[in-house]
Amino acid sequence: MGRRREVLALAAGWVVTRGAGSAWATTGVGQVLSSTGLADVVRGNAVIALAAGDAVYAEDIVRTGPDSRLQIVCNDGLQIVVGAGTELALRSYLTSASDGRLEVLLGLLRGIARLIGGASPTPRTVEIDTRTAVASVRSTEWLIESTDKGTGVLAIQGEVTVLGLAGGRVVLEPGQGTDVAPGAAPRTPVTWGQARRLDAIARTTI
């Protein structure tokens, strides 16, 4: 997994650093604002139930049940809504030593998540990898879903850059989405139909 993270990060032009090197690795990168149903976190060798008010840390893997949703508010204002049946790895949450930019690295192992880039005291870059793609943004609202059929990404506000692990790159404008099948490049951006867009947003609303 470490080598895969390096390849993904370098493809997006990032410097790879470990969550353990940040003070937030011990104080938490944010907390659970609200939740419905059962959710837990894999932290080291432990599995811990999550509820509103609980802290989350770098290198946690957040998991939701089939009828559960979870909203996380990070220390810098970034909001993450985790949909049902999802596993989301909080790989690292660090400030770059070179330019002071906050670099957030996440991994969507399966399921769906929506990210809302709230006001941040420092510039922020967010990157999420899946089994078929890596998506990155500066400050925007967007969602991403990972299934056995591949990855779907929708830009709600702002631009989202999507790289296929098999090659190819697209930039999504607001309202546009793309799909990345296993072993394929990202499809040409298109405006998602109302039914698909509203369904994805509804599944990431709590």
Regions found by a protein language model. Name each.
Residues 1-2, 10-18:
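N-terminal secretory signal peptides
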